[in-house]
Amino acid sequence: VKSTGKPVVILLVTGRPMTIAPETQAADGLLVTWHPGSMGGAALADVLSGDYNPSGRLSITFPLCLGQIPIHYNYKSTGRPHLNPDSDAKYLSRYLRTPNEPLFAFGEGLSYTDFSYSDLEVSSQKVKLGANVQVNVKVTNTGSRGGEEVVQLYLKDVVGSRTRPV
């Protein structure tokens, strides 16, 4: 199919992460559709034709290979200890001959346009248990097409008194 010169887009209908690195390298695009339901065909046609600009983000992580599993975005790296405990690296393994980063990480997603973030304001750098923090950010569509952006913010407990088991 690729030899025809036409763009090849993978529509991945799945309910879980899969190891799809070889397939994505051979394709020009990838759209994870999940299980779209009875109107999924029309919705996908709108996205593929450019009539609708996708703005979703992954709620899971797609591993690069089976050797990276399990990959959890919110668990301590007990099975893959960091060489430098102060490192912000998410994943580390001394046994894989492959990059430590997954193929597609939790929260990734693309759009037909571009956005810039500016003027980030956080009400507090430290948050006590049960307290609230207010965050403001200016989001600007810098592309040539209309679109929506999913703004994501993650907090990390650097020094937790208790951690959840994996």
Where are these regions (language model features)?
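A short helix->loop->beta-strand "cap" motif at the edges of active sites that frequently abuts
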Residues: 3-8, 27
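Secreted, periplasmic, or luminal enzymes acting at the cell surface/secretory milieu
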Residues: 13-148, 152-156, 164
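Catalytic core of soluble alpha/beta enzymes
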Residues: 2-3, 21
